[in-house]
Amino acid sequence: MRSRNQGGESSSNGHVSCPKSSIISSDGGKGPSEDAKKNKANRKEEDVMASGTIKRHLKPSGESEKKTKKSVELSKEDLIQLLSIMEGELQAREDVIHMLRTEKTKPEVLEAHYGSAEPEKVLRVLHRDAILAQEKSIGEDVYEKPISELDRLEEKQKETYRRMLEQLLLAEKCHRRTVYELENEKHKHTDYMNKSDDFTNLLEQERERLKKLLEQEKAYQARKEKENAKRLNKLRDELVKLKSFALMLVDERQMHIEQLGLQSQKVQDLTQKLREEEEKLKAVTYKSKEDRQKLLKLEVDFEHKASRFSQEHEEMNAKLANQESHNRQLRLKLVGLSQRIEELEETNKSLQKAEEELQELREKIAKGECGNSSLMAEVESLRKRVLEMEGKDEEITKTEAQCRELKKKLQEEEHHSKELRLEVEKLQKRMSELEKLEEAFSRSKSECTQLHLNLEKEKNLTKDLLNELEVVKSRVKELECSESRLEKAELSLKDDLTKLKSFTVMLVDERKNMMEKIKQEERKVDGLNKNFKVEQGKVMDVTEKLIEESKKLLKLKSEMEEKEYSLTKERDELMGKLRSEEERSCELSCSVDLLKKRLDGIEEVEREINRGRSCKGSEFTCPEDNKIRELTLEIERLKKRLQQLEVVEGDLMKTEDEYDQLEQKFRTEQDKANFLSQQLEEIKHQMAKHKAIEKGEAVSQEAELRHRFRLEEAKSRDLQAEVQALKEKIHELMNKEDQLSQLQVDYSVLQQRFMEEETKNKNMGREVLNLTKELELSKRYSRALRPSGNGRRMVDVPVASTGVQTEAVCGDAAEEETPAVFIRKSFQEENHIMSNLRQVGLKKPMERSSVLDRYPPAANELTMRKSWIPWMRKRENGPSTPQEKGPRPNQGAGHPGELVLAPKQGQPLHIRVTPDHENSTATLEITSPTSEEFFSSTTVIPTLGNQKPRITIIPSPNVMSQKPKSADPTLGPERAMSPVTITTISREKSPEGGRSAFADRPASPIQIMTVSTSAAPTEIAVSPESQEVPMGRTILKVTPEKQTVPAPVRKYNSNANIITTEDNKIHIHLGSQFKRSPGPAAEGVSPVITVRPVNVTAEKEVSTGTVLRSPRNHLSSRPGASKVTSTITITPVTTSSTRGTQSVSGQDGSSQRPTPTRIPMSKGMKAGKPVVAASGAGNLTKFQPRAETQSMKIELKKSAASSTASLGGGKG
C-alpha cells in the first residue's frame, strides 16, 4: 500500500500547484506542452478517486500544514511541467528577439537575397524563418551570377565580332584575287584558242606521212609473224616431250600412292588394336584405384565412428543418470509448490471478499451514509489487511511463475531423455552394422590383393604393347616422310608443268641462271659445313691441349705453393717471436699504468659511496613528515649524480682514446730505440771485427759470411726465376683460356652463320617460287592480250614498266639481269607511284602564285619546268601541287584529270580538220555516227614572223644509250625546221651480252615524237651517250621554225595540254606564256606538250615525270636504214575493265590490247585523259581516253629507222 499512498500525496500536492501553473502559463503567453496536459488529466482523475476521509484527516493539524508549506516537496511530474513551461517561455523570448531583429533588417538586404523588395512583411518573415532554420544561402547575393555571366557574354561577343571582321576582310581579299585571276585566265584562254587552230593544220600534214609509216610497219609485222610461227612450232614440240615426261611422273605417283594406302591401312589397324588395349588397361587401373580408395576410406571411417560411438555412449549414460536425479528433485519441488498454491488460493479468495467489503464501504462513505469514527478505524484495519494480502498476492504470482517454469523444464527433460534413448538404440544398430562392415572389409582386402596381382600382369602387357607402338610409330613416321617427299615431288612436277606450258625460252634461261645460283649457294653451304667440321676438330684438339696444360699448371701451382708456404712459415715464426717479446714488454708496462689508474678511480668511487651512505644515515633520523620531501631531494640529487657520472664516463672514453694514441706513439718510439740500439750493436760489432781484422784474428768468419751471402743471393735468383716462369705460364694459360672463349664465340658465330645460310637458301627457294608465280601472273595478263589464231605472237611479255625512277640505273646492276626481278620491281614501282600520287591528291591545293610568277618574261621561259593552265585547273576544283622529288631529270608536277572520249562499242570515229590560215588556227572534229559523241578540237599554232606552219619529220637513229642523269640533249642533225617539228626517235634493245633469250631476233625500235612551239638556242649540243629516253613512251613536242638545232626531248611535262571543254571541243594549247613551277631545269629547254596515258602508273591527279626500267640497260641499233612514215588511226576499243595498260614486248614490237593493272583507281581519276602510250618496243602510240566500259585509242604506228647515231630524251 506504500505505492498508493505516495501516489495520493503527489496528487494532493499537484492539486495545490495547478492554479499556479495556469497563472504562469497565462503570464508567459504560451500554453504548456502536450505532456503537461496529459499529466494534468491523470492528476484530476486521481483527485476524484481520493477519499474524503483522508482530506479530513489532514485538515485538523495546523502545524503540520505550516511545515508542509515551508518545505514543499514537488514531485517529478510537477518538475517536468515546470521545465516545459520554462522551455516555452524561452522559446517565446527567442521568437520575440528574432521578430525584433527581422524588423530592423533593411529592404536592400531582402532585395539582394530574394530579388525584389515589394512585400516587405512577407520577405521579412521568410528571412526570419531562414535565420531560424540556419540556411547556408542567407548571405548569398542573387545578382552576382547573372552579372558575371553578362560580363562573359560581352567578352565573347567582342571576340566573335573581331573574328567576323577578320573573316570578312579575308573573304574580300580572296574575292578580289579570284576576280583578277579570272580576268587573266580569260585573256589566256583566247590566246590558247588562237594557237590551237594552227596545230590542226600540222596534224593534217602529219597524217599523210603517218600513212606511209604504217605501210612500212605492216611489212615489218608480217616478217615478225613468220618468225613467231617458227618459234611456236619449236615450243609445241618441246611441249609434247614435256607432256610425255609428265605422264610418266603421274604413273609413278599413282604407284607410290597405292603403296602408301596399303601401308596406312596397316598402320590404322595396329593403332586401333593399341587403342582398344589401352582403353582396357585404363578401365582396369581405374577400377583398382577406386577400390583401394574406397577401402582406405572405409577403414578410416570405421575407426573414427567406433571411437566416436563409444564416447557418445558413455556421455549419454552419464547424462541419463544426471537427468533422472534432477527430475526427482524437480518432482519433489512440484509437490511442495502445488500445496503452497492451494493455500495461497484460499487466502486469495478471502482477500477478494475483503476487497469487495472495502469497495462497499467506500461507496457508502462517498454517499455520506456512514460517518462514524468506528467505521474509519475498521477501514484502516481493512486497508492494512489489504496491503498484507497484496504482498501475499505477489508471492503467489511468483510461485506460480516458478511452477510453470519447472513444468516446462520437466517436459523438456522428459523429451530429451526420450531422444537420448532413441539415439542409444540407433547407436546399437550402428554397432551391429559396423560389425557387418568389418566382415565385408576383410573380404574386400582379399579381393584387392587379387586385383593388384592382375594389375601387375596388365602393366607388363602394356609395356610390351607400348614397345610395339613405338615401332609402329617409327614406321608411320617413315611413311609420312615418304608421303611428304612424294607430295613435294608432285607439287614440283605440277609447278614445272604449268611453267613449261606458260613460260617462254626467256624463262628457261632464267631458271638455268637460278639453278646455277642455287648450286653455287649449295656449294657455299657445303664449303661452310666442311670448314665448320674442320674448325670443330681444331677446337677439340685445342681443348684437349688446354686440359693437359691446365693439369700441369695445377701440379706446378701446388708444388710452388708448398715451397712458398714452408718459406713464409719459417720467416713468420722468426718475426712472430720477435714481435711477441716486444709486445710482452709493452703490454706489461701498459698494464701497470692501467692498474694504477683504475685503482685511483676505484678509490674515488668508494669515497663518493661513503659520503652518500653517511648522508642517507642522517636523513633516516629526520621525522616522518619530512620524509617525502627528503626522498624527492634524494631523487634529484641522484639524477644530478647520474648526469655527472655520464659526463665522467665520456671523459674516461676520451682519455682511453688518448691513452691508445699515446701507447701507439710509445711503441713507435720503442721500435725506433730498438732499431737504434741494434744499429749501435752492429756498429760496435763491426768496429770489433775491424779491430780484429787489423790484428789478423777474424778473417775466416768474414769469408764464411760472404760465402753464405752469395749462396743466399743465388737461391733468391733461382726463386725469382722460378716465380717469373710460373707467372709466364699463368699468363700463357690465361691467354689460352681467352683463346678458348674466343673460339667458343667464333664457333657460336659460325653456327649462327650456318643457320643464316640455311635460312637464306630457304628464302632463295621461296623467292624462286614467288618469282615463278609472278611470271605466271604476268603471262596470264599477256594471254589476255594475245590474239589466238591470226598469226601474231602467242606470248607478249611486258618488258617496260610505268614506275618512277627513284634511283640511278646502274649498267652492271645484278638485280636487272633477270626479267623476273625486273617484273617484280616494276610491280613495286607501280604501287609506290600510286601511293605517292594518292598522298598528293589528298594534300590541300597550294596558294596561287603571283602575277610575275605566272607570267614570267620570255628570257626565263626556257628554264621553266611545266606549263600551267589556270582555267583548266579551276574546272577540276583545285590546283595540283607541284611535286619536286629532287633535282632529277624525270622531275615534273601533275595536273588534274581530263574528260574521256567514250564512243560506242564497234563504231568508228571520224576526224574532220578545217584549217584557217588567216587566223593561224585549225579545228579538229572527232565524231561518231550518233550526234551524242561529237567532239571538236581547235588548235592554235603561233607563227614566228610571217612564216606559214608546216610539219616536217626527221628520221632519227634507233641506237639509244640510257643514262639516269643526263643533261638536256639536242637532236643530232642540224637543219632549218618548220614552225612545228615532229621528231620521231627510234631505238631498239642491244642484242649484246646474251642476257635475252630473243637477242638473235630483230627488235622493233622505240619511237619518240617531240613537238615544241618556242624558239630554242642554237648552241645546245650534247653527246649521244648523255641522252636518256624512256622505253615504251611517246613524247609530243612542238618547236618553231627558227630552231636550227632540234630541241631536247622533255619527258612528261607536268600539265597535259589536250583538254575537252564543255562545248565538246578538244583544245591543244601551246605557247610560251604557260606558267611553270621553278625547278631544276637545264638551259635551252623549250615549252613542251606531253600527252601521257591515264591507265599507266601516273594515274592520279598529279602526273609525275617517269623513267621506265627495262630488263636491259644498254640499247644498240641494228644496221640497215628505211624510210620513216607515220599515220594516225582512231578506232574504238572495248576494255576488259575500267583501267588498262599498253605494254608491248621490246623484242617483238607487236601491238596489243590494254590489260588491267593491279594499281587501284582513286576517285579523283574518274575524269578521263587523252592518252599517248608507247608500247614496250615503242612502235605503237595510243591516244586512249578512258571510260567505264569502253575506250577509244589513237594508234601512232612508226616503222623502224636505222642509223648509227644515238638519240636520248631530255629532262622533263
From Swiss-Prot:
Expressed in muscle tissue, including heart. Found in cortical ventricular zone. By acting through a filamin-A/F-actin axis, it controls the start of neocortical cell migration from the ventricular zone. May be able to induce the degradation of Filamin A. Signal peptide: none annotated. Residues 1-15, 1139-1155 have a biased composition (Polar residues). InterPro entries: Cortactin-Actin_Reg (IPR050719), Cortactin-binding_p2_N (IPR019131). Its main location: cytoplasm. Keywords: Coiled coil, Cytoplasm, Cytoskeleton, Phosphoprotein. GO terms for biological process: cerebral cortex development; corpus callosum development; modification of postsynaptic structure; neuron migration; protein localization to actin cytoskeleton. Residues 1-73, 871-898, 948-975, 1102-1190 are annotated as: Disordered. This is Filamin-A-interacting protein 1. The keyword Coiled coil applies. Residues 1124-1138 have a biased composition (Low complexity). It holds the Pfam family CortBP2. PANTHER family: FILAMIN-A-INTERACTING PROTEIN 1, FILAMIN/GPBP-INTERACTING PROTEIN. Residues 191-575, 623-777 form a coiled coil. The gene is Filip1. The modification Phosphoserine is found at S137, S978. It is found in: Cytoplasm, Cytoskeleton. Interacts with FLNA. Interacts with RHOD (in GTP-bound form). It comes from the Eukaryota. Belongs to the FILIP1 family. It comes from Rattus norvegicus. GO terms for cellular component: actin cytoskeleton; cytoplasm; glutamatergic synapse; postsynapse; postsynaptic actin cytoskeleton; stress fiber. Residues 32-47, 60-73 have a biased composition (Basic and acidic residues).
